[in-house]
Amino acid sequence: MAILKDTIIRYANARYATASGTSTATAASVSAASCPNLPLLLQKRRAIASAKSKNPNLVKRELQAHHSAISEYNNDQLDHYFRLSHTERPLYNLTNFNSQPQVNPKMRFLIFDFIMYCHTRLNLSTSTLFLTFTILDKYSSRFIIKSYNYQLLSLTALWISSKFWDSKNRMATLKVLQNLCCNQYSIKQFTTMEMHLFKSLDWSICQSATFDSYIDIFLFQSTSPLSPGVVLSAPLEAFIQQKLALLNNAAGTAINKSSSSQGPSLNINEIKLGAIMLCELASFNLELSFKYDRSLIALGAINLIKLSLNYYNSNLWENINLALEENCQDLDIKLSEISNTLLDIAMDQNSFPSSFKSKYLNSNKTSLAKSLLDALQNYCIQLKLEEFYRSQELETMYNTIFAQSFDSDSLTCVYSNATTPKSATVSSAATDYFSDHTHLRRLTKDSISPPFAFTPTSSSSSPSPFNSPYKTSSSMTTPDSASHHSHSGSFSSTQNSFKRSLSIPQNSSIFWPSPLTPTTPSLMSNRKLLQNLSVRSKRLFPVRPMATAHPCSAPTQLKKRSTSSVDCDFNDSSNLKKTR
């Protein structure tokens, strides 16, 4: 009986052990099957997303859904950007930056160029680049920067910005940052500088409205304007909303709308790319970065790109200066200054940062960025041409101004004798008036109004066929120009009456361009001639041409340089020796 009982217990234990082993193996297999292959799933998810992004209809529907979803909150978002701008505006101080003992504007340009290289190489977002520039400008306005820590500071700012804006797979790692600086800084130095930046900027380092944020919201507002019930009390916000309301109707064009009888449509992606390019160039400019609000710079870039594309693609011309001079407000003046500065920066491609050239001006000859820069250059040339033609309006106002300025008393003063000839006209009176050099003593510098433009003289008193249709002009002439006109019977006019003291620019160069001919517009496309129109010098009267030596005279012997240690004549090539 005991043997039977022992056999039953052993059999039961064996069955229990078999069952427990089977259940354990089953649980292990189930757990192994339940754990997914994360790298494989990530690869599949990216492949699906890449395939969907190539479907234009799906992308268009997604953009429409996004547009309708955020239309309810766009006003709140814009108001949030303005509040951030007002909060961080006092943090930018150009005087403090210029007071840096070891950092100057050239070093800032080089550091920004280096950061843009790193940003392009890592393929980071546009917001990351602008936030990095913002962090560097904020810190340099409040704290002294050592020259040997400037690169560490810039790379740390790029690291923080990438962690804030970019996805985790694109975020710059510490190993990558060390490779970018050739292992000049350790990982501990990067982490220490990161903590120092957060503490120095009160832990609100990323709360900034960047250029691309303003560009996105402005373009969105131009296609979906504010409702009539929204009222903005601040002058800057009201001014920007007014310009955004006019932006979509300027020059008879619309943004992202079908072409109509009023004019063609513009691609919003081209405007965004061009505005971002101008804002990137503006970030390298010290005056624009510290002096003007970022919202105004973004608005000026959008407006400038839109007008340039209108003229480049559809030949629709609109003068940006005339459009802004109509209101004569402070914000209009600032916007005009920003637009002209951006045009000057876009014209000088030789001064572009090397990182900007490698990013946009690559070997591809048909890139969109190059066409946008060509549009800006054509617009700038046409703008300077129109300003040049506007200066020709002085010739049509000669007789009117002199007839109002020289009355009978002035004529009696000029012709003091009793036998004043009847043929004495206003032109002769003006000639004698300018020939009297005592009037030059009353010249004041207060009434000088730049820009100063000189007009070419005409061989006859009839108006030129190339006169501008404009009715006003702010240009002035000099006594030399008046005496020159006395031989041809036509005189230039001034802004004020000649009964007042004359206002002659003291710091301007007298430049007489060639007479207007049908080939003048093609000749004026030369950049050097356009630059010479605005060149100023300290001489009041034109410099006499240098007298050439007589052909029979002996050649002039050149003296050796003061820094030269070789006792030889530079005209004699036999005395020259090779030096290291």
UniProtKB/Swiss-Prot annotation:
<keyword id="KW-0132">Cell division</keyword>
<dbReference type="InterPro" id="IPR039361">
    <property type="entry name" value="Cyclin"/>
</dbReference>
<feature type="region of interest" description="Disordered">
    <location>
        <begin position="546"/>
        <end position="580"/>
    </location>
</feature>
<dbReference type="GO" id="GO:0007089">
    <property type="term" value="P:traversing start control point of mitotic cell cycle"/>
</dbReference>
<dbReference type="InterPro" id="IPR048258">
    <property type="entry name" value="Cyclins_cyclin-box"/>
</dbReference>
<dbReference type="GO" id="GO:0000307">
    <property type="term" value="C:cyclin-dependent protein kinase holoenzyme complex"/>
</dbReference>
<dbReference type="GO" id="GO:0007033">
    <property type="term" value="P:vacuole organization"/>
</dbReference>
<protein>
    <recommendedName>
        <fullName>G1/S-specific cyclin CLN3</fullName>
    </recommendedName>
</protein>
<feature type="compositionally biased region" description="Polar residues">
    <location>
        <begin position="563"/>
        <end position="580"/>
    </location>
</feature>
<feature type="region of interest" description="Disordered">
    <location>
        <begin position="454"/>
        <end position="498"/>
    </location>
</feature>
<feature type="compositionally biased region" description="Polar residues">
    <location>
        <begin position="470"/>
        <end position="480"/>
    </location>
</feature>
<dbReference type="InterPro" id="IPR036915">
    <property type="entry name" value="Cyclin-like_sf"/>
</dbReference>
<feature type="compositionally biased region" description="Low complexity">
    <location>
        <begin position="454"/>
        <end position="469"/>
    </location>
</feature>
<dbReference type="GO" id="GO:0000082">
    <property type="term" value="P:G1/S transition of mitotic cell cycle"/>
</dbReference>
<comment type="similarity">
    <text>Belongs to the cyclin family.</text>
</comment>
<dbReference type="InterPro" id="IPR006671">
    <property type="entry name" value="Cyclin_N"/>
</dbReference>
<dbReference type="GO" id="GO:0042144">
    <property type="term" value="P:vacuole fusion, non-autophagic"/>
</dbReference>
<dbReference type="GO" id="GO:0005634">
    <property type="term" value="C:nucleus"/>
</dbReference>
<keyword id="KW-0195">Cyclin</keyword>
<dbReference type="GO" id="GO:0016538">
    <property type="term" value="F:cyclin-dependent protein serine/threonine kinase regulator activity"/>
</dbReference>
<dbReference type="InterPro" id="IPR013763">
    <property type="entry name" value="Cyclin-like_dom"/>
</dbReference>
<keyword id="KW-0131">Cell cycle</keyword>
<comment type="function">
    <text>Essential for the control of the cell cycle at the G1/S (start) transition. CLN3 may be an upstream activator of the G1 cyclins which directly catalyze start.</text>
</comment>
<dbReference type="GO" id="GO:0051301">
    <property type="term" value="P:cell division"/>
</dbReference>
<dbReference type="GO" id="GO:0006357">
    <property type="term" value="P:regulation of transcription by RNA polymerase II"/>
</dbReference>
<dbReference type="GO" id="GO:1902806">
    <property type="term" value="P:regulation of cell cycle G1/S phase transition"/>
</dbReference>
<dbReference type="GO" id="GO:0005737">
    <property type="term" value="C:cytoplasm"/>
</dbReference>
<dbReference type="Pfam" id="PF00134">
    <property type="entry name" value="Cyclin_N"/>
</dbReference>
